[in-house]
Amino acid sequence: YKRQDYNDHMNVSYYLLMFDKYGADSLNNIFKMGEHSAKTTKKSTMIVESHITYDQELQLDDEVDINCVYFDHDKKRLQYKMEMIHKEKKFLASTIEILALYVDLNERKVTEFEEEKIKIMDEFISNNKSKFKYENLKFSSKLKK
């Protein structure tokens, strides 16, 4: 499979891969819901919906930063938005908004966050909300607050 497509720019699947590996995985680790949690507590998140924009094309070897620009949660769901910024030229290359569920992997069913995780997420919101971007959010109505 080619990382560069016939239009001579980065294939769309690699935008998603970068958001997943360098954005979502990082957030899940901060909130103690990542790979370690999946293996030890059998609880993790599963993405159920996403909305991605391709704002300016990237070339194959371009370096980018991925930043979380919005985050919220209810008792069972996470909503977050990330931006992909060209490292050198500082342009917005892409955004993704995610709706994910917290899942008990033994039961394969949605479950509620433990108090420890709620505390970590609320602290993250408190520390970062002044930098959040609230415009064009697609999934806010899906949180049950």
Give, region by region, the residue ranges found by the protein language model.
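A structural signal for short, hydrophobic beta-strand segments that form beta-sheets
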Residues: 47, 68-70
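Short, positively charged
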Residues: 35-36, 42-44, 62-64, 81-83
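Small beta-barrel nucleic-acid-binding modules, principally OB-folds
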Residues: 42-60
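HotDog/MaoC-like acyl-thioester-processing domains
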Residues: 54, 58-63, 70-145
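Hot-dog-fold acyl-thioester-processing enzymes
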Residues: 2-47, 104-145
